[in-house]
Amino acid sequence: MGGVTYFERDFDFDEHAREVDATWDPRVGGGPAPSQSVRALDDGEPGNLGTGDDHRRDPRRPSAADDDVSTTSAAQASAWDTFHGTHDSGVFFKERRYLLAEFPKLCDPDVVKSVLEVGCGSGSSALPVLAANPRATVLACDWSANAVRCATRAVERAKGLESKDRFEGFVSDPSTSDDLAGEVNRRLTRRGLNHGLDAVLMVFVLSAVPPGEGTASFLRRCVAALRPGGVVCFRDYGLYDLPMLRFPPNQRVGERTYVRQDGTLARFFTLDEVRVMFKDAGLVEEVAAAGDDTTREPVRYCCVHNENKKKGIKMKRVFVHGVWRKPLG
């Protein structure tokens, strides 16, 4: 972990939810107390999470939420491509080294030899996996060609990383592409990995997929690419995460769904919601193995304080975390 300590139970979710329910109305907005209304970055996630102060715009321009087309898959692909083109240096992102502690299977070379990261962005998730698991091949797809270029360049420039040819990026949108499984299998076969895909890494990506059939198709196609017995490692924004409370009402386009000023989508999930989505996609929740921390539920809210030490402010971040397995039968 490189000396980085990561906590996921900095505060109690139920207590946090009661406080929010008593003070916040999504139809009115208002967000947290003014002292907390600062730029909110999650640990290792880009600042595009912000609602307004992270993405400057002309105030005379109509809100992106006023345009229904902004929530289509094609519009989202375009918005994210523009975003990654603007931030193609990669300095806007931090490596998500905490994923190695949250998903320890990814580090085990005897268990995981092939990983598909869906929505690879700048490569901030792929890099720690490649460094921790010397036998893992990481395929990484994104609907943004700029993101794929950024991730590929980050791997090529990574210091101390051996066998950089273990990474391969490609452009694909699982919500619309019928051939994701074929694409993955062909790339693995060319590398002599004929046993199939061991793991799908799905980190801060489902929140960018339009809800409804787009999400269902996205999950079905990712599961189709996975071998029986393989796992999906999932982490995304959760109910009452700080940025959700900061969005103004005119950027709300659905239940717990918002459009940022740059046109990118932001969704915030409940535990029940993700359980239903992954079950409908044909997956089962992973059970704790011998030696695992049995005090942590397999599917849970991770409650993290992000601290701005300069201003002495703690920001309450809520993420949904879970691991699902594809049945053998």
What kind of region is each of these model predictions?
Residues 91-112, 128:
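Conserved alpha-helix/loop element of class I SAM-dependent methyltransferases that forms part
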Residues 302-329:
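Core SAM-dependent methyltransferase catalytic element
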Residues 197-213:
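A short SAM/SAH-binding and catalytic strip from SAM-dependent methyltransferases
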Residues 216-231:
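A short glycine-rich, Lys/Arg-flanked "PGG" loop and its adjoining helix->strand segment in the class I
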Residues 114-181:
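Class I SAM-dependent methyltransferase SAM/SAH-binding core
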Residues 1-73:
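N-terminal auxiliary segments of SAM/dcSAM-dependent transferases
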Residues 180-200:
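A short acidic, Gly/Pro-enriched loop at the edge of an enzyme's catalytic core
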Residues 238-308:
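C-terminal alpha-helical "lid/dimerization" subdomain adjacent to the S-adenosyl-L-methionine
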